[in-house]
Amino acid sequence: MRFLGGRYRLRRKLGEGGMASVWEAHDEVLDRQVAVKLLTPEHTADIDAFERARNEARSGARFAHPNVVAVYDFGTSRRAGRGTAYLVMELVEGQSLDRVMLDGPLDWQVAGRVCAEVGAGLAAAHGHGVVHRDIKPANVVLTASGAKILDFGVAARIGQPDQLPDGTLMGTPAYLAPERLERGTAAPAADVYAVGVLLYQCLTGRLPWPANTDEQMLHAHRSMPPAPLPTIAGLPEEVAEMCTASLSKLPEARPTSVALALLLSAAVDVPVHVPPVLRPMPVKDDALHAATEAISV
């Protein structure tokens, strides 16, 4: 069995793509099971692919939240003279949302809970200055403890340019907020728009527009209003309104990720963890008087 970084023993391959494979591994130092994303040597040698993997590690390591897959470590290992980058993450058991949705729309309460938890995870990211930029069903895994966001590989810091130097936009066309097409700066409102698309898709089994190609999707984001939600038995009006508001063409008209998470969690009666809003503690007159007296002594 392969050993990485002097501590991670690869045990079982969980999946493989063009750029990387994902393994179940054992952390010999902390004696726990982890997941390891292992880049191919070719992609490790590719500057863009390597930077994307490192960006995923750095973005995910900025904060911890129960609805975000935790990042533990990043490093490189050499074998047969070739370097291989690896990312060590929380090992989660569950199904990706895109696979679950192959069976059709979700019950509105399930859809509401999933998107409330995604919103809560994003609220934590936004609170630490991170915009995910690629929220979609394939990047959400459903576990026994709730939904978890995956893959911060194309994440950006709030205020950073929202495109590569050559003008390329990172993300998935079906979930790109209209303002992202103007190639401005990364902002949390774009993630909220993607959650709006996700919620609509969970409720209906389809995208909010009749678009089949990338070009049609980009045109829809810019110019087409979303199709009204169909009648869904039991769906609270405030959930439908939240979905519509999240899909606003104007970023300033969308709710924050915190507001989205809290409204949806209340609608389905499932608590979520959102960052606290810190405010100065009010000082009562008697406390202020006591403090003043203490200073004057």
Each predicted region: which residue ranges?
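Protein kinase glycine-rich loop
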Residues: 11-17, 22
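AlphaC helix of the eukaryotic protein kinase fold
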Residues: 40-62
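Activation-segment/catalytic-loop signature of the eukaryotic protein kinase fold
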Residues: 74-77
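Conserved short submotifs of the Hanks-type protein kinase catalytic core
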Residues: 81-96, 100, 104
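Activation segment signature within eukaryotic-like protein kinase domains
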Residues: 114-115
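Protein kinase catalytic-loop region centered on the HRD/HxD motif
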Residues: 119-130
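Conserved catalytic-loop aspartate of Hanks-type protein kinases
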Residues: 191
